[in-house]
Amino acid sequence: MQNIIAKVIEREGGDKLTKDPSDPGGTTKYGISQRANPDVDVENLTLQQAIDIYKEKYWHPSRAVDFPKHLMDMYFDMCVNFGQFKAVKIVQEAVNHKSKNTLKVDGRIGPKTLAAVQNLELNRLKSFRVTHYAKICMANKKLMKYYYGWFRRTMHI
């Protein structure tokens, strides 16, 4: 868990404070955005506070620990980037693409999803993640400037 959280923080730019007006998350530090965490003083956030937020808000609820080792980092990164509900839906869609719609795409981690992900290939999940980014950019052209970075982030996991 600690190692995966550290990787996410690194991918998110570490302690660099960003205030990009076109970023839907608003002010961000350690990957913790003001919009997703309105009760947090993001500008004065410490590394330990960020780690604690990742553990409580993302790691434990995501059940990433129940994913196969080869998918754990990718899945957790998706939960941070998209939110758990959307991340799970993307995982379920990737599973269904290969298994002919055996899972209900409901954004919930249940026993069927956990069993099905055991056979999901990392590259298949990467392709569904990149496709989701493309859909985001098609819906909001202003976010296109982030696409290459999102693509690169996905491919390096």
Which residues make up each language-model segment?
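Cell-wall polysaccharide-cleaving catalytic domain and substrate-binding groove, primarily
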Residues: 1-157
